[in-house]
């Protein structure tokens, strides 16, 4: 059984706005070394589902809200499925023929591949078909971040008013994992399938990356969870990312923390 082997002396604090089930969060500043090593700043938040405990390296930043960027593909997918904008994970979305800088976008996709390759144009079309009224209603039902969809309906998560913190990401993900969001269990199951990132004999990771570039500060995200035989660990990390050169650090730093705490080998 994997137990969190926290190697530092913890500061226990109650923080308003963190997941309602969490009365005490523990801070481990030793995790900061993983950011310092890569000359960056950021936060990692972990949640032990069995013990109902939260851990982070930076309590203040854990509660600071940023644009969700492409992590918003998780709620966008759920809403599109539940409203029938997307029939299922097999429906094909035809490439519009416009050549874009990211080569993997320049082809047909289904929900699984659109999530995997973070295909913005596909998700913008989802949002346009969902519309402002239904999008706003669903995000309120999800209690997703500040629920503010001001800006364009097909880009508010990239350059509009919506903001979400790492701890709020954890709250949302926990509801998704337990099929407790206000959409069908089928919709939640399909999205969790689309989030599959890594699977081996030790663990399964379901997650989504994000990279906010249109509004300063530019932020990189990785949010999701680690499924073990006897527990689930939720995670949400964001970090300063002035250029795209460090995109791989989102996963690398998170995994360094998970390994430090002996959650993954």
Swiss-Prot record:
Induction: Expressed from an upstream promoter, P(out), in an insertion sequence IS1999. InterPro entries: Bact_Transpept/Beta-Lactamase (IPR050515), Beta-lactam/transpept-like (IPR012338), Beta-lactam_class-D_AS (IPR002137), PCN-bd_Tpept (IPR001460). Changing residue 70 to A: Does not alter thermal stability. The active site is at residue 70. It catalyses: a beta-lactam + H2O = a substituted beta-amino acid. One of its GO terms (cellular component) is plasma membrane. One of its GO terms (biological process) is response to antibiotic. Class D beta-lactamase which confers resistance to the beta-lactam antibiotics, including amoxicillin, and moderate resistance to cephalosporins and carbapenems such as cephalothin and imipenem; in the DH10B strain of E.coli. Acts via hydrolysis of the beta-lactam ring. Has oxacillin-, cephalothin- and imipenem-hydrolyzing activities. Pfam families: Transpeptidase (PF00905). Residues 1-22 form the signal peptide. Inhibited by avibactam, related diazabicyclooctane (DBO) derivatives and by bicyclic boronic acids, via a covalent binding to Ser-70. Inhibited by chloride, bromide and iodide ions. Not inhibited by the beta-lactamase-blocking agents, clavulanic acid or tazobactam. It comes from the Bacteria. Gene3D superfamilies: DD-peptidase/beta-lactamase superfamily. Carboxylated on the epsilon-amino group of a lysine, with the resulting carbamate functional group serving as a general base. Probably N-carboxylated at Lys-73 at neutral pH in vivo and undergoes complete N-decarboxylation, at pH 4.1, in vitro. This is Beta-lactamase OXA-48. The gene is OXA-48.
């Amino acid at each position: 059984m994997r137990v969190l082997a926290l190697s530092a002396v913890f500061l226990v604090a109650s923080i308003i706005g963190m997941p309602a089930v969490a009365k005490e969060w523990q801070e481990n500043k030793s995790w900061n070394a993983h950011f310092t090593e890569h000359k960056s700043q950021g936060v990692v938040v972990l949640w032990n589902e069995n013990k109902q405990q939260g851990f982070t390296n930076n309590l203040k930043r854990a509660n600071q809200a940023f644009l969700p960027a492409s992590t918003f593909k998780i709620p966008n997918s759920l809403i599109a499925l539940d409203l029938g904008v997307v029939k299922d994970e097999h429906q094909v979305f035809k490439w519009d023929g416009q050549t874009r800088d990211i080569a993997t976008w320049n082809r047909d996709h289904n929900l699984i591949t659109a999530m995997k390759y973070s295909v913005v144009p596909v998700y913008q079309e989802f949002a346009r078909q969902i519309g402002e009224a239904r999008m706003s209603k669903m995000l309120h039902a999800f209690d997703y971040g500040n629920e503010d969809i001001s800006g364009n309906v097909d880009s508010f998560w990239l350059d509009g008013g919506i903001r979400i913190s790492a701890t709020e990401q954890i709250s949302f993900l926990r509801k998704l994992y337990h099929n407790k969001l206000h959409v069908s269990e089928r919709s939640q199951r399909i999205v969790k399938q689309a989030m599959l990132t890594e699977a081996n004999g030790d663990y399964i990771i379901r997650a989504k990356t994000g990279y906010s570039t249109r509004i300063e500060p530019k932020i990189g995200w990785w949010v999701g969870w680690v499924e073990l035989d006897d527990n689930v660990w939720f995670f949400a990390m964001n970090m300063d990312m002035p250029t795209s050169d460090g995109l791989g650090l989102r996963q690398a730093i998170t995994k360094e923390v998970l390994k430090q705490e002996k959650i993954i080998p």
